[in-house]
A protein has these predicted regions:
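PLP-dependent class I/II
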Residues: 4, 9, 25-31, 36-53, ...
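Short beta-strand-loop-alpha-helix junction that forms the active-site gateway
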Residues: 15-18, 372
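Glycine-rich loop-to-alpha-helix module at the N-terminal edge of alpha/beta enzyme cores
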Residues: 57-59, 73-76
Length: 395
């Protein structure tokens, strides 16, 4: 698409500012298809909103629990775009989805509690729950053709199970869940009394042929123990502004989130300018989100076509997110070793599977980010193909 080509990417700025395994942290000449972040600038309306607010020079204390307009906009977007009956009074703005996960864990977990975490899944589930003193048990993510199955989940629940981490859409697999499986998860929560940490940070990044189903569509009565986290980094490309929120379905759980967040004491909380940017994103930025989904759809389809013709690698078709999760077991290489080889010899950086980022269930895989131009992605895949051809021809 015209708005998402190399012409729109300022590589000099990325080399200076884009950290977390990206352009500012790799040697010159290396292409980073690593952390799930955009290579493109955010919507111009966000820049205009920040510039307009800053020019007056006033940055006073604001509402401890977030700007009312921001909370209303969040609830409205959840209702309109995801069919979630969210009330603004139960939405707590927070400084990033990652921080929101920690707030949920701190609010509802005690040392000695057990938590079920899918394997593989983003490491922040394990990190936030462990930080709160909980013990982690892993549930193997069962990838079906068109969804991740929850079959057998009940067998992993014990009397100590206090919380389940639920990534919807799933990172790194990029897959969704059926309504039947969501109903099953809520039924288990009602039966055993555990909480659900419901991560929906990827819920706007849905490919055109797929449909996102949310736990919250079943209504607040079914979601009494569901705590949802949302962030702006994937949807709007503003990771450095650290904009997110957590939301509950009742006053009791909301109050616990507020207490754990420490916003009323002003120790915690989201800053003023992040909320100004967040309002602009929600009120004026979704057109760009929809355009961006078209871009990543083209990138996904191109990447899968290229990978299908490469030796030693295969990849399922994701329904959501802007990452792909290829299987590289045929190469016979450990993912960490392959990623190091790619970076040092072929000048391509990607994310290895394994314990560090996604859990032991991600062994034999790598993750590749698609949130860039076709030109950058094409060259990155050229380098991946060259590496794999060299490896497989030497076997």
């Amino acid at each position: 698409m015209e708005n998402f080509t190399n012409k729109q990417i300022n590589f000099d700025i990325l080399k200076e500012r884009a950290h977390n395994l990206r352009w500012a942290e790799v040697p010159d000449g290396v292409i980073p298809l690593t952390a799930a972040d955009h290579d493109f600038p955010c919507a111009p309306e966000v820049v205009e909103a920040l510039t307009d607010y800053i020019k007056d020079g006033y940055f006073p204390y604001i509402e401890n629990r977030g700007m009312e307009r921001f909370k209303e906009d969040l609830a409205k977007s959840f209702r309109e775009r995801k069919n979630e009956p969210v009330e603004a009074k139960y939405v707590l703005p927070i400084d990033s989805a990652a921080r929101g996960m920690q707030v949920i864990a701190d609010a509802f977990l005690q040392p000695g509690d057990e938590c079920l975490v899918f394997d593989p899944v983003d490491f922040l589930f394990r990190t936030s729950m462990s930080n709160a003193g909980a013990t982690i048990k892993l549930f193997p993510s069962n990838l079906k053709e068109d969804h991740i199955s929850l079959e057998g989940l009940e067998n992993y629940i014990t009397p100590k199970t206090k919380m389940i981490g639920f990534c919807n859409p799933h990172n790194p697999m990029g897959m969704l869940y059926t309504k039947e499986d969501l109903d099953y998860l809520l039924t288990l929560s009602e039966k055993y009394g555990f909480y659900i940490m419901n991560d929906e940070i990827w819920s706007d990044m849905i490919y055109p042929e797929a449909h996102f189903n949310s736990l919250l569509e079943f209504g607040p009565e079914r979601n009494k123990r569901t705590l949802t986290v949302y962030g702006f980094s994937k949807t709007f490309g503003v990771a450095g502004l650290r904009i997110g929120c957590v939301y509950a379905t009742n006053q009791e759980n909301y109050d616990k989130l507020v207490e754990a967040s420490m916003v009323d004491s002003t120790i915690g909380g989201i800053n003023l300018l992040s909320q100004v940017a967040g309002i602009a994103c929600l009120e004026k930025g979704f057109y760009r989100v929809d355009q961006f989904v078209q871009q990543i759809t083209e990138n996904r389809d191109y990447a899968l076509q290229r990978i299908a013709a490469m030796p030693g690698i295969k990849c399922h078709k994701p329904q959501a997110t802007f990452v792909i999760f290829p299987d590289i077991t045929e190469t016979g290489m450990d993912p960490v070793e392959l990623v190091e080889l790619l970076k040092t010899k072929y000048k391509l950086a990607i994310v290895p599977g394994g314990e560090r980022f996604f859990g032991p269930g991600s062994e034999g895989h790598v993750r590749i980010c698609l949130a860039t131009s076709h030109e950058v992605l094409e060259e990155g895949l050229n380098r991946l193909e060259a590496c794999l051809k060299d490896l497989m021809s030497a076997k």
